[in-house]
Amino acid sequence: MTDFGHDVWWLVVAKAIAIFVFLMLTVLVAILAERKLLGRMQLRPGPNRVGPKGSLQSLADGIKLALKESITPGGIDRFVYFVAPIISVIPAFTAFAFIPFGPVVSVFGHRTPLQLTDLPVAVLFILGLSAIGVYGIVLGGWASGSTYPLLGGVRSTAQVISYEVAMGLSFAAVFLYAGSMSTSQIIAAQDRVWYIFLLLPSFVIYLISMVGETNRAPFDLPEAEGELVAGFHTEYSSLKFAMFMLAEYVNMTTVSALAATLFLGGWHAPWPLNLWHGANAGWWPVLWFTAKVWGFLFMYFWLRATLPRLRYDQFMALGWKLLIPVSLVWVLIAAVIRTLRNQGYQYWTPALVVSSIVVAAILVMSLRKPFSTPNAVTKARRRGKQPAAGPDEQGALEPLFPTPPLPMKPLAQPVGASKENARG
């Protein structure tokens, strides 16, 4: 923390511009890499027209979106409608100011860390900024004056509420063993051993939570095409839609960088490169850090190509019935072992590693179970009974789960409601 607050003004501006350029280039390359990777996994060429082998496709798409006509639907709240994309973009870029790219280096004779700034509670600040970004989504859905965007915004709010709890609990174990919430101090604490080896359950929980936090497949319920057309940005076009898309990919980059910072040693070189004396000095750490970030981005692309979208009840059950309880148990175990370490227990490292592997194995095996809430029909079939007569037997093709009613039609009654009404 003593390295911050001493930079000259032009160096601070240069760092801010460098972060902005890094994020914009990462977004352009990530979109192209995702489309190319999806094409290869689906046995098709992918983008191959604009530029050499399609390398300029993302840039062409960005220019096209910026030059498109901006269509503004009627019946909207104009101020909120136009401000919502900005609210999503600004926190996404701001969070990267606390991510360390490398150690202290010399820039034109000035010694400065490769990080814009740091705080004693930097990780919590990043967590708060990610929560602020969802305001843009929910406000955009509400201001659009349409049903599908509103449902997408509400879903996004529920996702953030559900998965930020698990994400915050995954940070707790890191704070316990690093002794700090500062990103630079957490990286310094991983000088010898990365926390992915000591705190494996926290890493697994964070991986799942960060996918849910960024609304990416298989957790992209706020913009599910088959249910909500395009979700919260259905009524957006041109540059406003591009800003929502930019915020999504910048958020992906930010949570990937935070994962590398908390669990993979940040800018520290991996083994066996760390055996080289100069691997963690100078500008080389920027390369190691960027490679780790791209590893997590590749995971995002892979998940989108291979996993189907979860149902909404499965997604909520995964967060509240598995991730949060396991996080609480793991934090308790980690705190007990940390207390033993403070009291002079010599074998705290093997105890922590064994506990970490056991809890992570239980968590991964539990992920194979379908997280769904059985309805009355499923429960009746499991008991070997026929379900009670419902609206379907009366000729109405109404679903047996809560849905918005069609115009001029009443809400579908749950199974067995007709019997209860008859008894009453």
UniProtKB/Swiss-Prot annotation:
A GO cellular-component term linked to this record: plasma membrane
Superkingdom, natural source: Bacteria
Bilayer-spanning residue ranges: 11-31, 79-99, 119-139, 160-180, 193-213, 255-275, 283-303, 317-337, 347-367
GO molecular function: NADH dehydrogenase activity; oxidoreductase activity, acting on NAD(P)H, quinone or similar compound as acceptor; quinone binding
Gene Ontology biological process terms in this record: aerobic respiration
Region annotation Disordered: where it falls in the sequence: 376-424
Its EC number(s): 7.1.1.-
Membrane topology: Multi-pass membrane protein
InterPro entries associated with the record: NADH_UbQ_OxRdtase_su1/FPO (IPR001694), NADH_UbQ_OxRdtase_su1_CS (IPR018086)
Compartments where located: Cell membrane
EC class (word): translocase
Catalysed conversion reaction: a quinone + NADH + 5 H(+)(in) = a quinol + NAD(+) + 4 H(+)(out)
Keyword Repeat attributed: no
Keywords per UniProt: Cell membrane, Membrane, NAD, Quinone, Translocase, Transmembrane, Transmembrane helix
PANTHER family the UniProt entry points to: NADH DEHYDROGENASE SUBUNIT 1, NADH-UBIQUINONE OXIDOREDUCTASE CHAIN 1
Cited function: NDH-1 shuttles electrons from NADH, via FMN and iron-sulfur (Fe-S) centers, to quinones in the respiratory chain. The immediate electron acceptor for the enzyme in this species is believed to be menaquinone. Couples the redox reaction to proton translocation (for every two electrons transferred, four hydrogen ions are translocated across the cytoplasmic membrane), and thus conserves the redox energy in a proton gradient. This subunit may bind ubiquinone.
Subunit organization: NDH-1 is composed of 14 different subunits. Subunits NuoA, H, J, K, L, M, N constitute the membrane sector of the complex.
NCBIfam families: PRK06076.1-2, PRK06076.1-4
Annotated family: Belongs to the complex I subunit 1 family.
Name of this protein: NADH-quinone oxidoreductase subunit H
Organism of origin: Mycobacterium ulcerans (strain Agy99)
